[in-house]
Amino acid sequence: MTLFLRIFTFGCLLLLAGCTTTQPQRDQVNWQKERTRLEQLSHWQLSGKMAIITVQQKGSARVNWQQNGDDYRLNLTSLIGTHILELSRSNGEITLIDNEGNPHQSQDAEALIYQLTGWNIPVQGLPEWIKGLPGKAEFELNPDSSLASVRDGQWQIVYGDYRDQDGYRLPHLLTMTGQGSRLKLQINQWTLAR
């Protein structure tokens, strides 16, 4: 009788498995083609929130980033709208306006931010990483050929929450760990220039 029950149970399982519906999987993205498309995306804007955790402090900010070719403008404000900093790069010149409205200039944006806030923010790699590009770093892909993670020197970036935006598949969540810091960037809105 037990052999009959086993065969009957196995048959029922096969029958049920045949009746289940499978979710259609998203078409595999050709990584090289998608990478080339993302590399050509040079004018965009995003807004979101960033959590910053270091050994000494925890903070959060609203983020607005505008990228125009090699130039950018990064605005950080508190969650209640108070100005924290504005960092801009224009024609190779880096300027940071602090929370008191004072301008500071440097050739090293990351060092300037750290000097004024104590936060390590990997500004140099962010324009590529934000779009889901690894630059020249080591990387891993998700099964759908989107970027899963990047390891670039002292920084590890883990991606999540990809969404379709104007024909691109863009990340809406990045967790960056490195240099004694952990940053979590939640992107609420992408605006792509045409």
From Swiss-Prot:
Pfam families: LolB (PF03550)
Role of this protein: Plays a critical role in the incorporation of lipoproteins in the outer membrane after they are released by the LolA protein.
Presence of the UniProt keyword Magnesium in the record: no
GO biological process: lipoprotein localization to outer membrane; protein transport
Gene3D superfamilies linked: Lipoprotein localisation LolA/LolB/LppX (2.50.20.10)
Lipidation (S-diacylglycerol cysteine): 19
Sites of N-palmitoyl cysteine lipidation: 19
Keywords: Cell outer membrane, Chaperone, Lipoprotein, Membrane, Palmitate, Protein transport, Signal, Transport
Database matches in InterPro entries: LolA/LolB/LppX, OM_lipoprot_LolB
Compartments, as annotated in UniProt: Cell outer membrane
NCBIfam families: lolB
Protein name per Swiss-Prot or TrEMBL: Outer-membrane lipoprotein LolB
Assembly and oligomerization: Monomer.
UniProt membrane topology term: Lipid-anchor
GO cellular component, one term: cell outer membrane
Family assignment from sequence similarity: Belongs to the LolB family.
SUPFAM superfamilies (UniProt xref): Prokaryotic lipoproteins and lipoprotein localization factors (SSF89392)
Organism field: Aeromonas salmonicida (strain A449)
Secretion signal, residue range per the UniProt entry: 1-18
